[in-house]
């Protein structure tokens, strides 16, 4: 079993955001870390300059890094942002909105907690289309696993 840390959902100052992930890299006993702005596309530019350093630091510490997509993609610029994310090299994309799947076109990726996977058929569908990791919804009863 691996311990995963989801992305920061809060609107922190960019330096605080960066320093948080640096501490995770140096101190936290987690295996997988999801980074990126998933809540609001308007906040993305504030963190963009820090993402390469954060990814490098986490990977150097032996963490697997997932690049999180937006939870809700509705604007043209958000679709472009999703396409840019899908073309990124060096880390799996964590899909949090199904519009991201089109741009991944069968490439390896992760399914984040904001995509509802409640049954085996859904999991099999995503597996067949490149999902290598699926984060199940927290409300899913243990008996259903």
Question: What is the meaning of each model-derived region?
Answer:
Residues 36, 113, 136-138:
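Short beta->alpha connector loops at strand-helix junctions that form conserved
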Residues 26, 31-53, 57, 69-76:
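Glycine-rich, proline-tolerant flexible connector loops at the mouths of alpha/beta enzymes
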Residues 14-15, 41-54, 76-78, 95-107, ...:
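Active-site-adjacent beta->alpha loops and helix N-cap segments on the catalytic face
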Residues 4, 32-34, 66, 94, ...:
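Conserved beta-strand positions in the central sheet of alpha/beta enzyme cores
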Residues 1-19, 44-45, 70-74, 108-117:
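Active-site mouth loops of central-metabolism enzymes
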Residues 28-31, 87-91, 105-111, 125-133:
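Glycine-enriched alpha-helix->loop->beta-strand junction motifs that scaffold or abut catalytic
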């Amino acid at each position: 079993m691996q311990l995963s840390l989801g992305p920061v959902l809060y609107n922190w100052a960019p330096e605080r955001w960066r320093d948080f992930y640096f501490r995770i890299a140096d101190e936290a006993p987690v295996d997988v870390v999801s980074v990126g702005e998933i809540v609001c596309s308007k906040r993305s530019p504030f963190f963009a300059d820090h993402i390469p350093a954060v990814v490098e630091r986490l990977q150097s510490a032996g963490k697997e890094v997932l690049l999180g997509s937006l939870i809700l993609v509705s604007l043209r610029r958000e679709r472009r942002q999703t396409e840019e994310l899908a073309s990124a090299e060096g880390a799996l994309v964590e899909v949090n909105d199904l519009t991201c799947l089109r741009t991944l076109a069968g490439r390896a990726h992760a399914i984040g907690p904001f995509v509802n996977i409640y049954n085996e058929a859904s999991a099999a569908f995503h597996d067949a289309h490149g999902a290598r990791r699926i984060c199940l919804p927290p409300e899913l009863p243990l008996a259903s696993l």
